[in-house]
Amino acid sequence: MSPLLRRLLLVALLQLACTQAPVSQFDGPSHQKKVVSWIDVYARATCQPREVVVPLSMELMGNVVKQLVPSCVTVQRCGGCCPDDGLECVPIGQHQVRMQILMIQYPSSQLGEMSLEEHSQCECRPKRKESAVKPDRVAIPHHRPQPRSVLSWDSAPGASSPADIIHPTPAPGPSAHAAPSAVSALIPGPAVAAADAAASSIAKGGA
């Protein structure tokens, strides 16, 4: 559908929605219900930031070592319909919002701060087409998916946090370039062996 035809259709529908009175599903006075107008339905369905509920485990991509309360939060994310099937609703503006989350690990609990991504502007853009991968080549991802949220700790003074736990570094093993042992130092090299052979031959000739 061309953009001009789409605009003409939208104008015609707007005029029809303004001139036509809404008709209730039930004619009886006891069953009268409010009918949402077409313009309101269209406005609610457009691509825009809207409040959604997201699980924190999904935001952190499974990097959760403690129980989080609450286990899900509400954030503003892009969503809605686009006028063409070849378009998708994507964010063109985002920012970070910090929230306090209670982290529980028996027998203690502490408050932490979580930085979550929120969308402020959305737009319908062409869908990304996946590039064809040749069977004799292995597809290598350009980037590794990163979590949308970052969890930081706000512990009480003196309390240890995961960032404070230092894992001991294993003791270095024997080096591959270690000095030769005493046994190997006693074994004559090729030059020493040649000199000994020459000295033996001279001694035999003199005898």
Curated annotation (Swiss-Prot):
The keyword Transferase is annotated on this UniProt entry: no
Record GO terms (molecular function): chemoattractant activity; growth factor activity; heparin binding; identical protein binding; vascular endothelial growth factor receptor 1 binding; vascular endothelial growth factor receptor binding
Alphabetized Pfam families for the sequence: PDGF
Record-annotated disulphide pairs: 78-122, 82-124
GO cellular component: extracellular region; extracellular space; membrane
Keywords associated with the record: Disulfide bond, Growth factor, Heparin-binding, Mitogen, Secreted, Signal
Protein's cellular compartments: Secreted
Xref: SUPFAM superfamilies: Cystine-knot cytokines
Region entry Disordered, spans: 140-182
Positions in coiled-coil regions: none
One biological process term in Gene Ontology: sprouting angiogenesis
Signal peptide span: 1-21
PANTHER family: VASCULAR ENDOTHELIAL GROWTH FACTOR, VASCULAR ENDOTHELIAL GROWTH FACTOR B
Role noted for this protein: Growth factor for endothelial cells. VEGF-B167 binds heparin and neuropilin-1 whereas the binding to neuropilin-1 of VEGF-B186 is regulated by proteolysis.
Subunit architecture: Homodimer; disulfide-linked. Can also form heterodimer with VEGF.
Family of the protein in this entry: Belongs to the PDGF/VEGF growth factor family.
Name of protein: Vascular endothelial growth factor B
